Amino acid sequence: MKICILNIATNKYIQFVEQLLESVEENFLNGHDISALVFTDHEIEEVSDNVKISQIDHEPWPVPTLKRYHYFTKEKEYISQFDYCFYMDVDMRIEGKVGDEIFGDLVATQHPGFWWKDKEQFSYERRPQSTAYVPEGEGKMYYAGGFNGGKPEHFLKMSQTIVDN
């Protein structure tokens, strides 16, 4: 299967691209055809055949990560060529083997700081005027933003919904 790894490497975070991609090659979905789509504000001339650079504006952190779903939807034609896509924070590493068990329409990561907490303790958006509003007593899990993905049609639909809101 064809897999696309998405990440944002702006400002000083460009230094983490190589180590992330090395850990992906070593531990993530071995045996599959893996490519990367790197969103960056740096001028990069030489990249390998399996890495595509998408140039974005230079903006201070955390603006680029807040705009991630905007970037993804602008590259929907490219991302749609893959069987699965996964966003990974560029400063993470894959330390253990991850196999086909990760495949799903949409995949997300439970936030480790909230694993054993009751949903009343989750830091959901509680302002009713927000499009991210979760009423008291609702919600099942609290998700981390550093890793998510799935089949492109589902991932891009989710991304577009986030952009629209």
Residue positions per predicted region:
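Short, charged, surface-exposed secondary-structure boundary motifs
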Residues: P62-L66, W116-Y124
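GT-A fold catalytic core of metal-dependent nucleotide-sugar glycosyltransferases
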Residues: Y69-D118
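Short His-Asn-centered micro-motif
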Residues: L6-A9, V38-D41, M88-V90, T109-H111, ...
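N-terminal anchoring/stem segment of glycosyltransferases
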Residues: M1-P64, E75-Q81
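Short, flexible, basic/aromatic active-site loop/helix in glycosyltransferases
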Residues: S123-K140
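Catalytic core and acceptor-binding pocket of nucleotide-sugar-dependent glycosyltransferases
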Residues: G137-N165
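Short glycine-/acidic-enriched loop or helix-start segments at secondary-structure transitions
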Residues: V17, V47-S48, G96-G99, S159
